Amino acid sequence: MDTRVAMISIVVENQGDIEKLNQILHEYGSYIIGRMGLPYPKRNISLISVTVDAPADKISAMTGKIGMLKGITSKALYAKLQEGCSEETD
């Protein structure tokens, strides 16, 4: 299956749906390469960066679900790599 490498940026302005956000990230956990979260108390927000290697439709579905959460926004930035297979070959 062809996959894309992408960075998903998430801004959490409302902590109310953070549990739902974590459920979504868990749902797509098999595609996640890494995740970094930074709280920013001065502005009362959290910034999360998630790196994925997944089919484009899965990335779109994940960012769409995250974007529907109240007070949480997300955007995906795709690497300019050719689509690749997630399975290793000899």
Predicted regions: what is each one?
Residues M1-D90:
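Long, contiguous binding/interaction regions
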